[in-house]
A protein has these predicted regions:
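Sec-dependent N-terminal signal peptides
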Residues: 4-13
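Sec/Tat signal peptide C-region and signal peptidase I cleavage site
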Residues: 14-18
Length: 213
């Protein structure tokens, strides 16, 4: 039992180190891109509908998934937590479980990543996103991704739709988009337009120009 527990801790430590090394050396714009930061062997972190650290039935109220916050539109309801079930592969210790209760195309649910110190949007610059996602059978919608203002006005500096149906099994998606405006402190956002549950892992965002600054 002890050997198994130590093995889990070692795997999580290796994953966290690799993630930080990628961020430092490879130009990764997403903070905590594989949801391994502060990994623990139990699920104890959950967000409220809009990212506030609310208490949900025994879960710690911290709302802490480093780098990630809620970004729901008015009228949308969703929450996220880390999970250790049905992971992407044996190397991963946990992934993101995003439960969407209320969402429509005109009032989508959203999650956002604030980057390491904000994400710089540079007009005309191309960004390449890769991520893995799977959905439960209830989710019938599409996903939009892009760069958005951190302010309450919700200004989009770049936005595009993820092509293809989100399936029940893990699938990797690659998306590119071009910024239409400048901002030093934008955030990366994923929006969903129907209720259901999504599982997300290995979210990576790169930009040749932005990472040189």
């Amino acid at each position: 039992m002890r050997k198994s527990f130590l093995s889990i801790l070692l795997l999580c430590s290796i994953a966290t180190y690799a993630q930080e090394a990628t961020s430092d050396n490879g130009g990764q714009l997403i903070k905590n891109h594989s949801f391994e930061e502060e990994a623990k062997p139990i699920r104890n972190r959950r967000f409220g509908p809009n990212g506030e650290g609310e208490l949900f039935g025994g879960y710690l109220p911290s709302g802490i998934i480093p780098g990630w916050i809620g970004a729901n539109s008015e009228g949308a309801v969703s929450q996220m937590e880390t999970t250790t079930k049905k992971l992407l592969n044996k190397e991963q210790c946990q992934s993101l479980c995003w439960s969407i209760t209320e969402a429509t195309p005109t009032s989508p649910a959203g999650i956002a990543n604030v980057g390491h110190n904000g994400i710089e949007a540079i007009k005309g610059n191309k960004y390449t996103l890769t991520f893995w996602v799977r959905a439960d059978k209830r989710y019938k919608g599409r996903l939009h991704v892009g760069l958005q203002s951190k302010l309450s006005d919700g200004t989009w500096y770049a936005q595009t739709i993820v092509k293809g149906k989100i399936k029940k099994r893990w699938k990797k998606y690659t998306v590119t988009f071009v910024a239409e405006g400048d901002a030093e402190n934008a955030r990366f956002v994923i929006t969903a337009d129907t209720p259901g549950t999504l599982y997300i892992d290995e979210v990576s965002l790169y930009s040749p120009v932005a990472t040189k600054r």
